Amino acid sequence: MSFNRDDDSKLKFKTSKKLKVSATFESMNLKPDLLRGIYFYGFEYPSSIQSRAISQIISGKDVIAQAQSGTGKTATFTIGLLQAIDSKSKELQALVLSPTRELASQSESVISNLGDYLNVTAHACTGGKALQQDIKKVSKNCQVVSGTPGRVLDMIKRQVLNVRNCKILVLDEADELLGETLGFKQQIYDIFTKLPPTIQVVVVSATMSKDILEITKKFMSDPVKILVKRDEISLDVIKQYYVDVEKEEWKFDTLCDLYDSLTITQCVIFCNTRKKVDWLSRKLTQTNFSVSSMHGDMKQEERDQVMNDFRSGKARVLISTDVWARGIDVQQISLVINYDIPDNLENYIHRIGRSGRFGRKGVAINFITKEERPKLKEIESHYRIKIKPTPANLEELS
């Protein structure tokens, strides 16, 4: 798991107290079998957020960790919780909550891989599949559950998920979980009331608004805050451009021109609605372009198949709504196209963060109509960046 160490080391953090920065995984005093899992997974040295946050999580403190996409936040909380788990006890000891099924499944995969030599058992509990499958899995000595709030709360209420000895709760992509948009906040509160009063809480996200930080006070005790300084959230490793298409109906031809001209490994195209995803996928397929698509209305088996095809490289172009913008890690994505400018400012950084993973160079291209120009200006102002016009010579993008 390589990343651009120079770019990562330039990140500046604002912390609530002076923190020890661990230059190596060995200096964190991790279990030998956990270290084996870390190195086998491909990590060589900790990223900036890992070098600051892992030791704080291991110490048992409540932690709020914020860093840009692709810097290893999932491994940060995973290493912390795996260090805390008692391998001899087969009871549930860690609970990870995520806003999407795909992200919950990805976290479970990272936990299982890093914890392989510890013989830790983990399971992803998400909607969209038979409840009985989850009940069967968690009843068999499951030490870590990674899931979506609705399914996890349902299983706790049914008393099939026993949380009485749970040591650590992780909220991944916390701004989504605690925001008003997706309606998870009450479910998070309800889950929290079922957990032991001594539970350690770790909150992780690429963006962290003042409102979300205020909400965390309700269930966190004097948390250590590790936040990227505001002017560092520009994702410098990603070249950002716009194409002024003037009218909505001209976007499609522009996309076809780009598709023909660019040499890419893998690409994600974001639309704001499920209807637009289906329309664009159908239209591109009719024009003999090979694409796959995914959104929240699809059955879970379909979404899983799309994800597997994209991860394996079988599919090169994926069209999606913002369900895919959060935390999903596919290393070979080199291009993100915002067919629609996101309605939510925070989603811009989550979308373009799909390219440039772990410091790799990536490109983001934004299609804008006359009506969308103010949105682009708002994004530039919010992130203190300048998004350039797409160069006439498209080879400059590669």
Curated annotation (Swiss-Prot):
Location of the motif DEAD box: 172-175
Enzyme Commission no: 3.6.4.13
CDD domains per UniProt: SF2_C_DEAD (cd18787)
Subcellular location(s) of the protein: Nucleus, Nucleolus
Major location (coarse): nucleus
Residue sites binding ATP per the record: 67-74
UniProt entry keywords in alphabetical sequence: ATP-binding, Helicase, Hydrolase, Nucleotide-binding, Nucleus, Ribosome biogenesis, RNA-binding, rRNA processing
UniProt catalytic activity: ATP + H2O = ADP + phosphate + H(+)
PANTHER family, per database record: ATP-DEPENDENT RNA HELICASE DBP3
Entry protein name: ATP-dependent RNA helicase FAL1
